[in-house]
Amino acid sequence: MKIIEFRKKIPYLRYLEMQEKLRKFRKECILFLEHAPTITGGINYNPENLLVKPEFLESMGIQIHWTQRGGDFTAHEPGQLVLYSHVDLKKRNLSIRFYLENLLRSVIDSVRSTWDLQLISDSDSPGLYLESNPSQKICSIGVNFKSFFTSHGIAFNLSNDLKTFRCINPCGRNWTNMTSVKDLGFDFGLHKRDELISCLKKNLCSFLEPINVSSS
């Protein structure tokens, strides 16, 4: 399996094309990247959770796309670290539950190691929240398991300004419940981003086979 870190923003539609090719050939790969301001609706989206008209989004330069991942509406924007994980569960004989639990555990352990920040999950509302204030969400998750090959993944709010979230009720919740490392007053510099990615690689390798690393 490869890990690829993109330093440039990747258009959301380009990612959708990439993940379809990866699934077609069942080619495992983990991607770290950022998107330009984008809103996506998952297979369980509620139209009422889109708070503005598509015409307004277009005028603000915000793209909107409908996807086959789980969940409702979420937002992507510069400064948010996105981790897309493409894993062949059938080949690895892994259950969906095991995969999800360990994906979230990898993020929890990595964030704790990087900032000494404690996060918790919520079985009733997927994602990761502050242990000190469970109403505050810092990480979204949405995964597609078509043909037992995963795509999509997690979006962690690092230094993004959260403005795009104001256009939606993220996963059915008020956008004011969203937070970021920057908003919490922690160091969000490039070196901390790199440290987080390094920790994520290590923790992902704890439940997946060794990964070959490349950059783009």
Curated annotation (Swiss-Prot):
Protein family (similarity comment): Belongs to the LipB family.
Any Gene Ontology biological process: protein modification process
Binding site for substrate: R69, G70, G71, D72, F73, T74, A75, H76, S140, I141, G142, G153, I154, A155
Cross-referenced InterPro entries: aa-tRNA-synth_II/BPL/LPL, BPL_LPL_catalytic, Octanoyltransferase, Octanoyltransferase_CS
Pfam family, one: LplA-B_cat
Subcellular location field: Cytoplasm
Role noted for this protein: Catalyzes the transfer of endogenously produced octanoic acid from octanoyl-acyl-carrier-protein onto the lipoyl domains of lipoate-dependent enzymes. Lipoyl-ACP can also act as a substrate although octanoyl-ACP is likely to be the physiological substrate.
Pathway connected to this protein: Protein modification; protein lipoylation via endogenous pathway; protein N(6)-(lipoyl)lysine from octanoyl-[acyl-carrier-protein]: step 1/2
Misc. comment: In the reaction, the free carboxyl group of octanoic acid is attached via an amide linkage to the epsilon-amino group of a specific lysine residue of lipoyl domains of lipoate-dependent enzymes.
Keyword Acyltransferase tagged: yes
Residues of the BPL/LPL catalytic domain: 24-212
Coiled coil: none
EC annotation from Swiss-Prot or TrEMBL: 2.3.1.181
UniProt enzyme class: transferase
Protein's recorded name: Octanoyltransferase
SUPFAM superfamilies, A to Z: Class II aaRS and biotin synthetases
Active-site feature positions: C171 (acyl-thioester intermediate)
GO molecular function: lipoyl(octanoyl) transferase activity
Keywords: Acyltransferase, Cytoplasm, Transferase
Reactions catalysed according to its record: octanoyl-[ACP] + L-lysyl-[protein] = N(6)-octanoyl-L-lysyl-[protein] + holo-[ACP] + H(+)
Domain of life: Bacteria
Organism field: Leptospira interrogans serogroup Icterohaemorrhagiae serovar Lai (strain 56601)
GO cellular component: cytoplasm
PANTHER family: LIPOYLTRANSFERASE 2, MITOCHONDRIAL-RELATED, OCTANOYLTRANSFERASE
